[in-house]
Amino acid sequence: MEIEEVFARFRNIKHGIKTRKKSTSIHYGDHKSGFKGAGYDIVGVDQWRPGQPLKDIAWVLSLRTYPEKLFRIERMEPKELRALFVVDLSSSILFQLSQGSNKALLMLDLIGNIGLTRANVRDPVGLLGFSDRIETFVKPKLGNPQVFYIAKQIFEKIELQRRFPEKRAANFTVPFRFIASRLKNRHTLILISDAIDFVNDRAALDFKLLGTLAAKHDMMMLILDDPEEFRVRSSLGYIRINDMETDRQTVISARKAGAIRRTIEERMSELQYMLKHKSGVDSVVLTPQNHGDALAEFLIARTAR
């Protein structure tokens, strides 16, 4: 896959596809969050009157005039909300991107679709790519060209991986700590990964740290999946699968392929449960076949709460 192909896909998204039409009506900044207070701009100060919310009272300003007169702070939630794609760029993902796999195309479509939708409602968009280190960080900026620049940054990583192959797994703690130390303002954080590291190791995610971030930021996780990877097409009942790290093929039986697929589905369901109940993070599993409707339904369900 080449960068020109991705730009062409993004231009198609820009001119309107089914998913974008559904998601354009959703302002991502409207999602509710556990974060309170500092996400608002102070518009002005005036006298508090009975019937107005008690939480608006500025007690520090009212100390000298209490109880005869109380003052309130008028706050307004900013319409602009920075969006940051937190994208898994481990060796396996970069390999899939270079090969143009369905899962890789799904990732790029999601970045293009959501990114351009955010740009259309004048929200700055950025990128945080990670493996077991921070691979790239693009600060959120306004405009459609920013989304194309993000795609270009990802492809530069692909080219670097081609020239100087490195085996790097996804360590989710790395971006979480980066976010905790660097992002002072509230963001929408869109975590995109195939979650294979969690499938292989349940301890791959620090749910406590994730919960701390989710309390401050509007956070969601989009889990990439492709059931077709383990569909047996051979009449002999065997399937060839690629080792994402070595580019070698392995032949496995239909029974083993089915067992692997069931394990992946079970672990992904477990991951979604733990994300919700341990960290308060909404998530959805998206496939190349269902992502158009599933993404729109997921976002609409979040705004309805």
Feature names for model-found ranges:
Residues 1-31, 37, 47-55, 61-63, ...:
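Exposed, interaction-prone extracellular/peripheral surfaces
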Residues 69:
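A short beta-strand signature within small-molecule sensing/ligand-binding domains used
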